[in-house]
Amino acid sequence: MRRALKPGDSEIRALPLGANTKFARDLLGDGRARALDIGCGEGKFTRGIAAFIGEVVGVDVKERAILKARAAAQAEGVAVDFQIASGESLPWADGHFDVVIFSNSLHHMPDPAKALAEAARVLAQGGLLYVMEPVAAGHYHEATSFVNDETIVRTQAWVALNSMLGQGLSRAQENLYRSRRVFASFDDWKDDQLERDEKRRAKFDADPDGVKTRFEMLADKEDGKLAFDQVFRVDLLTKA
């Protein structure tokens, strides 16, 4: 039996940050008719997969994110239907999609198990469930956890995904890949974190020197910049 890959393994495939759309295409192939991206945020990944999937729908509970996604799709001339909807209560009939996707979103679901059950419900027989999640390990995770610790929610998402096996879903593939994240400075990373969620400011303010020291200690130094490998897991499941 092939041993499980660990986040520090050198054999984990290295991909440029932002190459997850190409990775999805490699796994899903061309010609899929209809895909749903659950928790799509501002829709960058969703717009990317529209290049090789016939009809693409993206949903998110945040109206602001959906408005930005629609504006970007219009500006780029990409045909994607963005809707405000919860991943735990999807407004489609059983078996409506032949691909359902969680791209870095399953751990953000209030109830991952319920969201996965809904995903399985709207997935057609023979369809593919594509789940990409950041792994709760490695130096980037350690550095970021000081202001946004997602260890518990990522673990809960992983447990929920595995609990679906044998309930009409089977795992076709499990892949680990790493992307290099490079920041010009600590302040560059801080700005990135605050853009993601302003609520993280309180963590920075509580121990500014400690957060900075920890971040810089964990980073690789590359030409005066601070770099990390972030590890992602991509699971591809099929519906019988």
Annotate each PLM feature.
Residues R13-A33:
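Conserved alpha-helix/loop element of class I SAM-dependent methyltransferases that forms part
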Residues R2-P16:
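Class I SAM-dependent methyltransferase Rossmann-like catalytic core
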Residues L36, E42-S89:
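Class I SAM-dependent methyltransferase SAM/SAH-binding core
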Residues D98-D111:
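A short SAM/SAH-binding and catalytic strip from SAM-dependent methyltransferases
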Residues A113-Q125:
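A short glycine-rich, Lys/Arg-flanked "PGG" loop and its adjoining helix->strand segment in the class I
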Residues P112, G168-A240:
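Conserved Class I S-adenosyl-L-methionine
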Residues E88-V99:
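A short acidic, Gly/Pro-enriched loop at the edge of an enzyme's catalytic core
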Residues L128-Q156:
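Conserved class I S-adenosyl-L-methionine
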